[in-house]
Amino acid sequence: MRLYRDNAVVLRQHKLGEADRIVTLLTRQHGLVRAVAKGVRRTKSKFGARLEPFAHIDVQLYPGRNLDIVTQVQTVDAFATDIVDDYSRYTTACAILETAERLAGEERAPAPQLHRLTVGALRAVAEHNRPCELILDAFLLRAMGFAGWAPALDDCARCSAPGPHRAFHVAAGGAVCVHCRPPGAATPSPGVLDLMDALIRGDWASTEDVPESLRGQASGLVAAHLQWHLERQLRTLPLIERARPHAAVRVEDSVRQDGDRDSTTRTSSPA
């Protein structure tokens, strides 16, 4: 089998034996790839540091039966340099990598849009020109769009009645009209769904003056919507809530509920 090259983001790694590591890569053309990096834990390894999480690399691989083998690595962007020493940036970037891996699908299924989105999100976190929670929420919303899970933010998610609508229900698919509104639907403050829509569209100018309270509500709805579809919580989201306690207010505390609260309109508490 022939060697192949691809552009990749290192999602995670773990030890294999005394000197090797298994790395999980999100590649542009081959989707998720798991590969062995031989000897990278040795002091004299020629590319060990280039295979750390958050790295954006150009990699050459040899196809294997179960795991490919890394043969060459060149750094494209060393995002970790500007991420790992800042807790907020680090936890945000970890959530981006975890989400990318969960949404990439089966191994070797091409995911060029998700790859490009992940690289862009890591670059934005490293440059730190915008609040980390907005970068993360924009990434999550767009990534869910690629997976077919984008929440309805204007027209009713159930009957398509023209919006805007005030109620939001995760299990229903997003914004719902007064006729389709199920028990337990949340009523976000005015401007929250507009913020989420601006993040999906990349309209950053519209996000600049949004109060932290509205950003916190939007973050809660985005996280709840993602976790509903994933069917289990991302490990990194509670860490992000601790990193920004004022902005990442839990949904049940920041969004007024009509009727009994239910698990479809809240995020899980940090452990």
UniProtKB/Swiss-Prot annotation:
One Pfam family of this chain: RecO_N
Gene3D superfamilies in UniProt: Nucleic acid-binding proteins (2.40.50.140), Recombination protein O, C-terminal domain (1.20.1440.120)
Biased composition (Basic and acidic residues): 249-264
GO terms, biological process: DNA recombination; double-strand break repair
Cellular component, GO, one term: bacterial nucleoid
Cross-referenced InterPro entries: ARFGAP/RecO, DNA_rep/recomb_RecO_N, NA-bd_OB-fold, RecO, RecO_C
UniProt key word ATP-binding: no
PANTHER family recorded: DNA REPAIR PROTEIN RECO (PTHR33991:SF1)
Sequence similarity: Belongs to the RecO family.
Known function: Involved in DNA repair and RecF pathway recombination.
Name of the molecule in the record: DNA repair protein RecO
Organism: Rhodococcus jostii (strain RHA1)
